[in-house]
Structures are given as structure tokens and as C-alpha cells.
Design a protein with these regions (language model features):
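C-terminal "cap" of GNAT-fold acetyltransferases
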Residues: 151-206
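A short helix-loop-beta-strand connector motif used in the catalytic cores of GNAT acetyltransferases and
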Residues: 46-58, 67, 88
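Conserved active-site alpha-helix within GNAT-family acetyltransferase domains
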Residues: 129-147
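Conserved GNAT acetyl-CoA-binding A-motif
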Residues: 115-127
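A short, internal acetyl-CoA/4′-phosphopantetheine-binding micro-motif in the GNAT/acyltransferase core
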Residues: 90-100, 127-128
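Conserved GNAT-fold acetyl-CoA-binding loop/helix
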Residues: 9-12, 23-47
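A short beta-loop-alpha structural element at the N-terminal edge
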Residues: 2-22
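Conserved acetyl-CoA-binding loop-helix of GNAT-fold acetyltransferases
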Residues: 94, 100-113, 136, 140
Length: 214
């Protein structure tokens, strides 16, 4: 197998190629009817989502794009990250033939280096409610479940995770209560398939979420 190089995305790798890789890598999930936000975004939308402060890492076998991951940097606005410099890992994908070679670890080394440069205080991630394995992995890595939500452009519920790099400022009990409240209100608001039960009920749940800040 030709040598694989991991690097910051060069200009000659287009954002449309990143989009096509995400589609190819997540083909099985798509066939199962699992809609993922990263696979519904166009190349231009991916570029705009990451913004100027984001960083896209790629794995190249010759001139072929075989893997990618990205990190988005922002200032937090929620109860768990307000005013903090936040990094969110996103859009990770590796073609099946190249999995198991440690490419994700290599790409993550570059994203971790970038996060240090940006003085990141909090790392965030999300995964599908039913992805029990990933939820366990994130928990073992020190992430806490802070929010249950219906993600945009997805047909399933997701769980949002946070890891405070400078020490967690909240008690486990407080965090669990916030998460449980967001889950209960979301389940009241939406039925199976993430379908709103009624417009009136949805508005009430949205107002309650804002009122109790979840």
C-alpha cells in the first residue's frame, strides 16, 4: 500500500471531496435510514460551518482522499460552556479499506495540537442516542452528558457531551439533573422519528427549556 500522509487540508483538496468522502464512509448508516447532519451538508456548507477558526485534517494516499476529521473553535454560549473557548470535533470519516491503520489517531494529533494553539478550555462532542458504544467511550475519556436534543437535519435524537480541561465547575448531580430535564422535555416535544407531537406542545417545551436553561 502506498504511503499515507496526514496533514492540514491543502487547497487542492476541495470541500466537495470532503463531502463525497463523508457520504462514502457513512454509506451503511445512510442505507439504514440514519440521517446524519454531516452527510446532508454540501461542500460549501461544510466550509462555512467550520469557519475561519476551524481546521480540517485529511489523510491522503497519493492524491486520493481516504480520511478526514475536523475541529470547530467557538466561544461557548450555553450553561455548560458560556464564555469559554470551545472545540468540537466533527466530520470524522475513513474509507473502509483504510480503517484499522491508526489514521484517526494521527489526524487527532494534529487537531489536538491546534486546540493547544487556540488555548481551548472545553472539548465538546455529540453522538446518536442509540450509539451506546460511543457514549461509553466518551464517558471513559472524561466527557459528561449535558444535553439531549433533536439535532438539525437528523432523524434521530442525539446526546451532547462536554469535557472541561480546567476542571469541572459543576457537581455530577447538577449536570445529571440538567441532562434529565432536557431529555424529558425533548421526549415530550417529539414522538418517534423525531416528529413534533403538536405545535402548541412544542412551543411550551421550547419555552420551558429556555426558562430552566437546558
Amino acid at each position: 500500500m502506498e504511503d499515507i500522509k496526514v496533514m492540514i487540508k491543502p487547497d487542492w483538496v476541495s470541500w466537495d471531496e470532503i463531502h463525497e468522502l463523508l457520504l462514502a464512509a457513512h454509506k451503511k448508516n445512510i442505507e439504514k435510514g440514519v440521517v446524519m447532519n454531516t452527510t446532508t451538508m454540501t461542500g460549501e456548507e461544510i466550509k462555512n460551518y467550520l469557519g475561519e477558526s476551524g481546521r480540517c485534517i485529511v489523510a491522503l494516499c497519493g492524491n486520493e482522499l481516504v480520511g478526514t476529521t475536523s475541529v470547530k473553535i467557538a466561544i461557548g454560549k450555553s450553561w455548560f460552556d458560556k464564555g469559554k473557548t470551545v472545540a468540537k470535533g466533527t466530520m470524522s470519516a475513513i474509507l473502509k479499506h483504510y480503517q484499522g491503520l491508526g489514521l484517526l489517531e494521527e489526524m487527532n494529533e494534529l487537531t489536538n495540537q491546534y486546540m493547544k494553539e487556540k488555548s481551548v478550555q472545553i472539548i465538546e462532542a455529540d453522538t446518536a442516542e442509540d450509539n451506546v458504544m460511543m457514549r461509553k467511550i466518551l464517558a471513559k475519556k472524561g466527557f459528561k452528558e449535558v444535553r439531549f436534543f433533536p439535532a438539525k437535519n437528523q432523524n434521530h435524537f442525539s446526546v451532547y457531551f462536554v469535557k472541561w480541561l480546567e476542571g469541572c465547575p459543576f457537581s455530577d448531580r447538577f449536570i445529571q439533573r440538567k441532562f434529565n430535564l432536557s431529555k424529558v422535555l425533548t421526549k415530550i416535544q417529539y414522538g418517534p422519528g423525531k416528529v413534533e407531537r403538536s405545535h402548541f406542545l412544542s412551543r411550551i417545551c421550547q419555552c420551558l427549556k429556555k426558562l430552566i436553561n437546558v
